[in-house]
């Protein structure tokens, strides 16, 4: 079994790459693929670049060239739900776009025409994650949260951005810039997927400062959770 793991930035894939004893690097169209093993599993680790288009290009190349049987997305996210703290982990059971509006043609806000309104994380992987992280976080000051993640091609930090997202997605847990695009490609290639991200900021007016300060913490937390999951696959 080959498992695809995707992060947008070097900071989000570096720790995982460093656990691979032997790495083959392949660069296609600016996307960096690292082929090797993590936790005894065959892995293709992708540094896709930031944003929905980069994520979609990279995920498509991953699916077409490397044929993964599972895709997992790692990295950071901005927390939107009450009670979330930096270092908490969000496992997405659903994803949607926060900046797509074709409602005039009868689609749900966030829905790309002829695509689902929401992309569902794989039920089997979600169940595994729930079991693993219940034990993993029982001794931690942080926690794992499950729910809706919204993807935008914007860094969310202003009140008006919050208001728009909450208007259409009142149960949103976190926001970021790639996951729904990854999910859409996985859906179109019929590949089971799971999104696991750690909170680097609270998507507020201090978000840029928090992100710069805590991106490495979030990357470490997310990478650790993915390694724990890989041990069970």
UniProtKB/Swiss-Prot annotation:
Keywords: Amino-acid biosynthesis, Hydrolase, Methionine biosynthesis. It comes from the Bacteria. Substrate binds at residues 78, 156, 177-178. GO terms for molecular function: adenosylhomocysteine nucleosidase activity; methylthioadenosine nucleosidase activity. GO terms for cellular component: cytosol. Belongs to the PNP/UDP phosphorylase family. MtnN subfamily. Pathway: Amino-acid biosynthesis; L-methionine biosynthesis via salvage pathway; S-methyl-5-thio-alpha-D-ribose 1-phosphate from S-methyl-5'-thioadenosine (hydrolase route): step 1/2. The keyword Hydrolase applies. InterPro entries: MTA_SAH_Nsdase (IPR010049), Nucleoside_phosphorylase_d (IPR000845), Nucleoside_phosphorylase_sf (IPR035994). This is 5'-methylthioadenosine/S-adenosylhomocysteine nucleosidase. Its EC number is 3.2.2.9. One of its GO terms (biological process) is nucleoside catabolic process. The active site is at residues 12, 201. It comes from Listeria welshimeri serovar 6b (strain ATCC 35897 / DSM 20650 / CCUG 15529 / CIP 8149 / NCTC 11857 / SLCC 5334 / V8). It catalyses: S-adenosyl-L-homocysteine + H2O = S-(5-deoxy-D-ribos-5-yl)-L-homocysteine + adenine; S-methyl-5'-thioadenosine + H2O = 5-(methylsulfanyl)-D-ribose + adenine; 5'-deoxyadenosine + H2O = 5-deoxy-D-ribose + adenine.
